[in-house]
């Protein structure tokens, strides 16, 4: 039996899913995919535009469809999901049943620091991001934890250190 090595990175905005995912994929010699990039490429517009036109519900539907398509077409990948991908029950089920789910945990302070100048995140187009981030974490943290095979704290850690922690976990789980 050929074992599929799918690794899914979940977590809040600013946790480093894309940055860590690229390095993890490079180290493990797997393909890296960012679901937000795939959505933008497929739709031909940026995520802000989709949110403005279709709202969050429309975006989440597209996100679920794209993740489902990726998992139907690809194996042996590192997939960085959007921070809210776990809001959809079908997406949670897909991720938890098709690979190892790594929850990259980040504090509100870290999220604020990493998103302070970012204008590409539709839910953070506000003057005071802290209350929004706090609300998002209150809603999403239980969902992240519910499907995570491992939780990796990203605060104060280097990308290399985080990648090594994930790799160690994957070896212990015999996925590598």
From Swiss-Prot:
It is found in: Cytoplasm. Mg(2+) binds at residue 18. Keywords: Amino-acid biosynthesis, Aromatic amino acid biosynthesis, ATP-binding, Cytoplasm, Kinase, Magnesium, Metal-binding, Nucleotide-binding, Transferase. It comes from the Bacteria. The keyword Nucleotide-binding applies. InterPro entries: P-loop_NTPase, Shikimate/glucono_kinase, Shikimate_kinase/TSH1, Shikimate_kinase_CS. Its cofactor is Mg(2+). Its EC number is 2.7.1.71. It catalyses: shikimate + ATP = 3-phosphoshikimate + ADP + H(+). Substrate binds at residues 36, 60, 83, 140. Pfam families: SKI (PF01202). ATP binds at residues 14-19, 121. Its main location: cytoplasm. Binds 1 Mg(2+) ion per subunit. Pathway: Metabolic intermediate biosynthesis; chorismate biosynthesis; chorismate from D-erythrose 4-phosphate and phosphoenolpyruvate: step 5/7. GO terms for molecular function: ATP binding; magnesium ion binding; shikimate kinase activity. GO terms for cellular component: cytosol. One of its GO terms (biological process) is amino acid biosynthetic process. It is an enzyme of class 2 (transferase). PANTHER family: SHIKIMATE KINASE, SHIKIMATE KINASE 1, CHLOROPLASTIC. Monomer. Belongs to the shikimate kinase family. Catalyzes the specific phosphorylation of the 3-hydroxyl group of shikimic acid using ATP as a cosubstrate. NCBIfam families: PRK05057.1 (NF003456). This is Shikimate kinase. It comes from Francisella tularensis subsp. holarctica (strain LVS). The lineage of its organism: Bacteria, Pseudomonadati, Pseudomonadota, Gammaproteobacteria, Thiotrichales.
């Amino acid at each position: 039996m050929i074992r599929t090595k799918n690794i899914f990175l979940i977590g809040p905005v600013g946790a480093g899913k894309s940055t860590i995912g690229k390095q993890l994929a490079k180290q493990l010699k797997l393909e890296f995919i960012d679901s937000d990039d795939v959505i933008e490429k497929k739709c031909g517009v940026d995520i802000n535009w989709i949110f403005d036109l279709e709202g969050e519900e429309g975006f989440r539907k597209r996100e679920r469809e794209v993740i489902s398509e990726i998992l139907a077409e690809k194996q042996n990948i590192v997939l960085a999901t959007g921070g809210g991908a776990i809001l959809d029950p079908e997406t949670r089920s897909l991720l938890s049943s098709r690979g190892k789910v790594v929850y990259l945990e980040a504090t509100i302070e870290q999220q604020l620091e990493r998103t302070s100048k970012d204008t590409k995140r539709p839910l953070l187009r506000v003057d005071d991001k802290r209350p929004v981030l706090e609300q998002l974490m209150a809603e999403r943290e239980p969902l992240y934890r519910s499907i995570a095979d491992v939780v990796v704290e990203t605060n104060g850690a280097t990308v290399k250190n985080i990648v090594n922690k994930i790799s160690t976990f994957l070896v212990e789980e015999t996925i590598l």
